[in-house]
């Protein structure tokens, strides 16, 4: 294996988000940390296709290796959903994480310049670092509510830029380009020598405009990524995909031959049903999330300046700043220890005074989480007053 990531896992930096969630996720009683919609059960999925994995089908399922690009039925379902552009094909993967790994391993060499929208999910920056790339942040500025400023992107692009890596809607802030901004972004990349990596994990979770179109419809040098973990409520299936230029397929398959080879036929059968019934899974969760988003914004507005919350334009997370804190990590620890409430401290995204709050959960769970935060903020404020009295 000749790619820079072939140097071995020791080249990969720690993943602070996963380090935070690893044990706390299983300790929490109230989870308002998640960047995905709340999960579906197998029974709920089977209700969409009662024949799914019945006794007869299970008995006939052959546990053989799958095709390198993925099961044909699942690939066809994804293609019908996302509509890849000319010269692009769908490859299914073990979550979008595998697809991202394959892309960075295939495309990046030591010293390459990689532009990453920042703050970033750890895979988007960490894989570039492990590949020996020179990172150039495209800053999504907190003072602008993390709204993407394409002039800032223009300023960091150069003739040495190998990749431009974006994630819209953005994790953790929920910021998003609108359709006009998408067109301008694609034009900027088209006029450079760079390849665009478009993380579309949250594509279906938008609040102010229709979902953004698949970028390969308008750009040749692009790979896009999707997953069942965020909008579909099926993270435990560990299924994702990439839309990849045909001329790059053989390189991704070559690298995959050293990793996972293919997906389980059992998992791909379940995943195909999910994608074929995408709207039935996504629509109710998105409707619920929009109601909950309104509640989070009302809660923040009622905090008398203690919480400054940019409006999430997409996704199901808010990323508010806590104005009396320079680092909310201790607050997050207290929420879990005293209330059983799980949130994510902003330091894992390089924004220590912020907290990621997931709002796609049942309303009672969200209310418990917000009430616990308010209680801890009140305790903190009273302590400060005593300390200065």
Curated annotation (Swiss-Prot):
The gene is vioD. This is Capreomycidine synthase. Pathway: Antibiotic biosynthesis. It catalyses: (2S,3S)-hydroxyarginine = (2S,3R)-capreomycidine + H2O. The keyword Signal does not apply. GO terms for biological process: antibiotic biosynthetic process. It comes from Streptomyces vinaceus. Keywords: Antibiotic biosynthesis, Lyase, Pyridoxal phosphate. PROSITE patterns: AA_TRANSFER_CLASS_2 (PS00599).
């Amino acid at each position: 294996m000749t790619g820079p990531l072939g140097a071995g896992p020791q080249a990969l930096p720690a993943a602070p988000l996963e380090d935070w969630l690893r044990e706390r996720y299983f300790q929490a009683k109230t989870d308002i940390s998640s960047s995905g919609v709340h999960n579906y059960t197998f029974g709920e999925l089977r209700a969409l296709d009662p024949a799914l994995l019945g006794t007869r089908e299970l008995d006939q399922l052959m546990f053989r290796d799958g095709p390198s690009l993925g099961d044909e039925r699942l690939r066809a379902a994804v293609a019908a959903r996302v509509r890849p552009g000319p010269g692009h094909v769908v490859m299914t993967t073990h979550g979008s994480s595998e697809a991202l790994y394959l892309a960075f391993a295939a495309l990046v060499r030591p010293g390459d310049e990689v532009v990453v929208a920042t703050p970033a999910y750890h895979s988007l920056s960490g894989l570039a670092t492990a590949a020996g790339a020179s990172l150039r942040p495209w800053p999504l500025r907190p003072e602008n509510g993390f709204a993407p400023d394409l002039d800032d992107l223009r300023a960091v692009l150069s003739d040495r830029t190998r990749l431009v890596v974006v994630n819209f809607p953005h994790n953790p802030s929920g910021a998003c380009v609108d359709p006009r901004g998408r067109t301008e972004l694609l034009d900027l990349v088209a006029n450079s020598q760079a390849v665009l990596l478009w993380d579309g994990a949250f594509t279906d979770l938008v609040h102010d405009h229709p979902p953004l179109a698949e970028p390969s419809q308008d750009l040749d040098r692009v790979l896009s990524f999707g997953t069942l973990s965020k909008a579909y409520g099926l993270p435990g299936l560990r299924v994702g995909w990439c839309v990849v230029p045909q001329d790059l397929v053989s390189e991704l398959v070559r690298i995959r031959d050293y990793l996972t080879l293919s997906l389980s036929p059992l998992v791909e059968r379940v995943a195909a049903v999910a994608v074929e019934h995408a709207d039935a899974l996504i629509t109710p969760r998105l409707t619920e999330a929009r109601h909950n988003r309104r509640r989070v914004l009302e809660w923040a507005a009622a905090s008398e300046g203690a919480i400054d919350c940019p409006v999430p334009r997409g996704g199901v997370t808010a990323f508010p700043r806590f104005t009396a804190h320079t680092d909310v990590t201790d607050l997050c620890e207290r929420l879990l220890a005293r209330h059983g409430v799980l949130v994510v401290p902003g330091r894992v995204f390089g924004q220590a005074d912020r907290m990621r709050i997931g709002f796609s959960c049942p309303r009672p769970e969200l209310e418990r989480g917000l009430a616990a935060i308010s209680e801890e903020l009140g305790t903190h404020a009273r302590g400060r007053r005593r300390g200065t009295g």
